[in-house]
Amino acid sequence: MDKTLEIIKDRINEKQAQLAHAVGEGAAKDYAEYRAICGEIRGLSIAEGFILDLADQMERNNDE
């Protein structure tokens, strides 16, 4: 995987872990905040998927 993409993926994973830990510790003041945090985690997961797809495509293009 490209070094830049690896760094971005790692940062996304770190943020996901921070948010998951915060939810586990009861950081959400109410249900709306809980939903917002869960939405952020979901968005980060989608972004990570895009990065992994891009890295895969870049590797396939380099093989051609």
Predicted regions located by residue number:
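Short intrinsically disordered terminal tails
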Residues: 1, 58-64
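N-terminal acidic leader/helix
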Residues: 1-29
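Sequence-pattern detector for short linear motifs
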Residues: 12-14, 18, 38, 45, ...
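Short, charge-rich amphipathic interface segments used for partner binding and complex assembly
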Residues: 28-59
